[in-house]
Amino acid sequence: MTTTHPPFCVLMAGLPGSGKTTLSRALTARGFVRLCPDEEMYRRHGVYGVDFPRGTFPTLERPVLEDVAVDLREQLKAGRDVVVDHGFWTPEDRARWSAVAADAGATPLLVYLAASHNELWERVSKRNEFHADDPNSIYFSENDLQRYRSRFVPPAVDEPHVLYDGDPVTVIAALEASGRARSVEDDSR
């Protein structure tokens, strides 16, 4: 979607099963371009743990993320609203991608998708059965999920974000509010 306001870039902080893909698809229904590194990994390398060994994911993902960042920059510079369907587990990752968005003239918005271990595991264990055919259903165990949680750093109070309540309208309202704030800021210059 090409916009009359500076484009929005929605970045998400959340573990597997937290609802990132569901939210990103809801935003695409509103005209957002969706970029998903996991889908690109699947296109390039196949099924995680089947077509390439489990331990190689970070190495294979690095160039994918670099290419997605280039695509993000191009989409935003073209005036399109974009949602990046990725977990952004650390403040450093979130800051880096937020800077890419801001440098491209976009208004970045971080959305935190919090969920309990039980909620995450219930969703992930259901998705595991589809891992061979669905790039958004990477197979992993409950121990993997616990290990991932130990590496995930939720956004702190000093890291601006919207806490996702399960309703995409909340995110849309936050985008509209940040867009209005940016318009007022631009008008005052």
Q: What residue spans do the PLM features occupy?
A:
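Hydrophobic anchor at the beta1->P-loop junction of P-loop NTPases
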Residues: 12
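NTP-dependent small-molecule kinase module
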Residues: 2-4, 150-189
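Conserved beta-strand scaffold positions in the cores of enzyme catalytic domains, especially
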Residues: 32-34, 108-110, 159-163
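Conserved nucleotide-binding/hydrolysis micro-motifs of P-loop NTPases
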Residues: 39-41, 114-120, 168-169
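Walker A (P-loop) ATP-phosphate-binding motif of ABC ATPase nucleotide-binding domains
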Residues: 9
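Conserved substrate/cofactor phosphate-moiety recognition/catalytic segment
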Residues: 18-80
